[in-house]
């Protein structure tokens, strides 16, 4: 009996980083029931995430024993290099969102502590998503990520737009989840398995099955919604605009990284990428995402909506990587999503630092709110400038390296049309990213509606924003270190 118990405990070692976050959730719940304290709750959340991150890094370095999964868990989850790489990114992004939330909620008089609880619960779902290798764990972890987001998006419910964004995401996300379930049912009916690898083994006998193609298409529709890929992108700008700034940051970083990692593993492990119909569907989604995302962003006057449309275009670039090089897309897609997530944290972080949850008129999301920011806050302007240049793919930023790899992936797959689409999309994107930069350096308005404190760089959120800016510049100047780092993200 003791041996059995010890084996069970050893089988939980690979999950130690996730268990650390689960324990943090319990501690936060107890802390809230004992005495409400924003500082205590925020500190516990950050400490718990740091512990999980350090355990994960220790396991990757071989310092901490990572054990082996119990047989029952092996059917649902896998802890490989790909999962560990994306878990590191999720931990870093969740830490950034927690610290930005602390600064954002400082002036909120209502309950602040529950936001950390929801964010930690959602992070557990995200961590499980990148490890899922079974359709049951696929759906379970996805819902663990999504359900807390409904409350997080509506957290500043005193603002109509925030409440609207939460309700809109709830309704549309539920529809996407139902579509995913239906697709899973069709695939199971055809191949008789919910595990990714057995689906791949039976694919040769059911290659042209209409039921399999329909199931794969329905699953791709659900995945496209979660990724904000066209034509399932309509919700993105509205939800980004209405969401509290730190939650928009979370949606653009943690949620996107987890969903893309799950999608890549699903497509590679099941070999569904071998289906010509799936390849064509991905190509259409990628093309529409790049064109619609960039063209619609050109007309935006809201920075948050602009970043929302920008995210649609960037998901298109990653889809091109997946459809072009197939099973080799794991490391490049992970690298692209990591840099995109860090850039989103920097851009939305500036919005968060300048916003207040109690302004019924909204947050600092209009471009006019940033007019002349350079003359008041030059360092903050430098942060936003670097983020915009990285999103545009300008040299000496990490965004340039990832976009270059996306083009090279399309060329390697001889998808010349898709390579041209990346170049065209980048050219269009350059216009609206530079428009943001011109606004920052214009002559300031006489009346300043939104501003940040002079000591913003010493606050927790400000430190995190500066840190991700340094990462973007470092990997842009020394890309070899980023490439070596991303090469670890391989699916076994």
Curated annotation (Swiss-Prot):
UniProt KW keywords: Cell inner membrane, Cell membrane, Membrane, NAD, Quinone, Translocase, Transmembrane, Transmembrane helix, Transport, Ubiquinone
Gene Ontology MF terms in the entry: NADH dehydrogenase (ubiquinone) activity; NADH:ubiquinone reductase (non-electrogenic) activity; quinone binding
Domain of life: Bacteria
Catalytic function, reaction form: a quinone + NADH + 5 H(+)(in) = a quinol + NAD(+) + 4 H(+)(out)
Pfam family membership, one: Proton_antipo_M
Broad class of enzyme this protein falls into: translocase
Keyword Transport belongs to the record: yes
One Gene Ontology cellular component: plasma membrane
Family, as annotated: Belongs to the complex I subunit 2 family.
Quaternary structure (record): NDH-1 is composed of 14 different subunits. Subunits NuoA, H, J, K, L, M, N constitute the membrane sector of the complex.
Protein name: NADH-quinone oxidoreductase subunit N
Gene (name only): nuoN
